[in-house]
């Protein structure tokens, strides 16, 4: 079931902040999950990216393009 964090994610999906050292990890994971065409795995990764921002581990702002994944907000990290 959606949580309060999920609602905040939907509100803030256009500008997600993540920790700089994690950027290459997320880029690689997004690329791999996209190749598997598994939207559930991509959605989980999106939540991980958001939670990094929610806990204040922020060095860099990445712009995120929203798209629907299984009827819920998902995202593709751009510019990596």
Curated annotation (Swiss-Prot):
Q: A single GO BP annotation from the record? A: proteolysis
| Main localisation | plastid
Arranged from A to Z, the UniProt key words for this protein are:
Chloroplast, Hydrolase, Plastid, Protease, Serine protease
| Intrachain disulfide bonds | none
Q: Name the residues annotated as catalytic in the UniProt entry.
A: 19
A GO cellular component entry from the record: chloroplast
Q: Which reaction does it catalyse?
A: Hydrolysis of proteins to small peptides in the presence of ATP and magnesium. alpha-casein is the usual test substrate. In the absence of ATP, only oligopeptides shorter than five residues are hydrolyzed (such as succinyl-Leu-Tyr-|-NHMec, and Leu-Tyr-Leu-|-Tyr-Trp, in which cleavage of the -Tyr-|-Leu- and -Tyr-|-Trp bonds also occurs)
Q: Where in this chain does the entry annotate a coiled-coil region? A: none
Name the Gene Ontology molecular function terms of this record: serine-type endopeptidase activity
Provide the protein's localization. Plastid, Chloroplast
Assembly mode: Component of the chloroplastic Clp protease core complex.
- Which family is it part of? Belongs to the peptidase S14 family.
Q: What does this protein do?
A: Cleaves peptides in various proteins in a process that requires ATP hydrolysis. Has a chymotrypsin-like activity. Plays a major role in the degradation of misfolded proteins.
Protein name stated in the entry: Putative ATP-dependent Clp protease proteolytic subunit
> Lineage of the native species?
Eukaryota, Viridiplantae, Streptophyta, Embryophyta, Tracheophyta
